[in-house]
Amino acid sequence: MRLGGVVSALAIVITLFAIWGISVNKTYLWALKENEKYEVQCKDIPRSDCSPPVLFKAHPGCCPHKICPADQYPFFIRSGVANIVGPKICFNNTIIMGEVKNNIGWGLNIVVVQGETGEILKSSYFNTHSGGLLEFLKSVQTGNKIFVASYEDPAVVLTDEIREIFAGLGSTMSRSVKRRDTWVFAGAAGIVKESPFEKLVANDEKSNVYGDWPEMREVGGCFPRKI
Ligand SMILES: *[C@@H]1O[C@H](CO)[C@@H](O)[C@H](O)[C@H]1NC(C)=O
Ligand SMILES: *[C@@H]1O[C@H](CO)[C@@H](O)[C@H](O)[C@H]1NC(C)=O
């Protein structure tokens, strides 16, 4: 009887902590979202005059400015955060896809760039409702670069054939991406080795930071024009 009481009390305490944890991160997500909106409003204002009004400055909407050698292009990819904050793909220190540009969606967000000139060839997002990812990937030509960011659930569009195409673009993790995982990847058509620019976080209810979703991930660096 007494032991039962202790166990119930423990269960209640654990549940309360779990609820508290989720609400803490709801606040964090809200702050991220507010942060993004504010960054949109002040994107043409000097950074020193423009600090977001919310709790902390977590992941600002602008691209982290990066200088690369002349034969390389800077890029930056951030995955979506849970199903709340959209992903961001920057190329040459410019946002190509993001909340700011209102051109992102659940599923996979993808930008394709002409390798040497740096021209943006196409950008789109794919989920069960939009389809078309296979045709999109088949039109990627040798030397093109590809930048991929997950949002909410990347696995919905990943057929075996599509996973293999990503593997051919340098991905070592595309075959392992599961429902609601976080995945960011930069690769190239004609790449001979594995891309170093890839991160995957598994959706695991025991370690998820956002309830049904794991932590977000970022990857960035200098991508060689020629591969
Ligand atoms: C909430 O999210 C932040 C950032 O992702 C993380 O550092 C923190 O541990 C999370 N808090 C809880 C209670 O899960
Ligand atoms: C990349 O950025 C540099 C510096 O802003 C600019 O001069 C160049 O034209 C850009 N290249 C492309 C392909 O956008």
Where would I find each of the regions flagged by the language model?
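Short acidic-hydrophobic catalytic motif
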Residues: 1-146, 151-227
